[in-house]
Regions:
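Preference for long, amphipathic alpha-helical scaffolds in soluble/luminal domains
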Residues: 1-286
Length: 287
């Protein structure tokens, strides 16, 4: 690839970084460069295992359950998740983070689907981890979408991304082409899911009500909340979400059905030769 090379001791770098740190930075760059060169294959390329956090495995277990697929490999996936649990009961999203709530909730749900009882000591520690951080409603939107798919929270509380966005032209500034390519491959099928709101109920013993601070939370407090002390700009997304949900409540059939057909067409036209979309698991799960 082309481009200019900037010395770590160029004037622009010296001005931006305290001088006392330059030697440390230079040594770190040298070590990193040496390590990369040692890993290079004689043919000129690099190859290494692509690692991820346990959400990939947990979501794969959820996919098998939602679609009613063969679950014979689930025990092995369950063992892999348990092997990566931290001493504090949580699961990491990156090494050394001390555990992350969304990752932990997804792992917990997948383990219960796999048959681990709520009284298992490992799940008890995970429950303590989640409740100490505010409960399952403190998770990211993607995690709450998985919870909604299995009836653990209401779809009404999920921030809405209407499938009608498929109809917006690129010049509008709000079309799907404002997203990166891999995000589009995830968002387009996700908009179909949000329009259809499917739910595959779980047996009571596999649900996760114990991860909420209150039994009313999944229904009554699970929504995009207005922040009383925040500025109007900070609450703009709350306002937009409520407007979009009002529009969705009106259930206008023509634009909705046309947008669904356009989304389906987009998905079929953008499938890779390898059979996937954008080379990531999340887009495949949503599709």
């Amino acid at each position: 690839m082309g481009g200019d090379t900037i010395s770590i001791r160029s004037q622009s770098v010296i001005d931006a970084v305290p001088r006392i740190h330059l030697n440390r930075i230079e040594r770190a760059v040298t070590r990193a460069t040496t390590a990369m060169l040692e890993m290079q294959d004689p043919a000129g390329y690099w190859w290494a295992e692509l690692e991820s956090n346990v959400t990939i495995t947990a979501e794969y277990i959820m996919l098998h359950r939602f679609l009613g697929l063969d679950e014979s490999k689930v025990p092995r996936m369950m063992a892999d998740i348990l092997d990566k649990q931290l001493p504090n009961g949580g699961w990491s999203i990156w090494r050394g983070d001390g555990g992350e709530i969304s990752t932990t909730v997804e792992a917990y749900l997948a383990l219960k689907m796999a048959g681990l009882p709520a009284e298992d000591p490992r799940l008890l520690k995970a429950r303590e981890f989640v409740l100490a951080r505010g409960g399952a409603l403190k998770t990211r939107v993607f995690t709450r979408i998985f919870l909604a798919l299995f009836g653990q929270v209401s779809w009404d509380g999920i921030p809405l991304l209407p499938v009608e966005f498929m109809l917006l032209p690129p010049w509008s500034g709000l079309s799907i082409y404002e997203f990166s390519s891999w995000t589009r491959a995830t968002v387009v099928p996700l908009m179909i899911i949000m329009a259809k709101r499917p739910v595959r109920p779980l047996p009571p013993e596999q649900g996760i009500p114990e991860l909420f601070l209150s039994s009313d939370e999944p229904v009554f407090q699970h929504r995009v909340a207005w922040k009383g002390e925040a500025s109007l700009l900070e609450n703009l997304f709350v306002i937009l979400d409520r407007i979009l949900k009002l529009y969705a409540w009106m259930r206008l059939p023509w634009p909705r059905n046309f947008a669904l057909r356009q989304a389906e067409k987009w998905i079929l036209e953008h499938q890779e030769d390898s059979g996937d979309w954008a080379g990531i698991q999340l887009s495949l799960i949503h599709i």
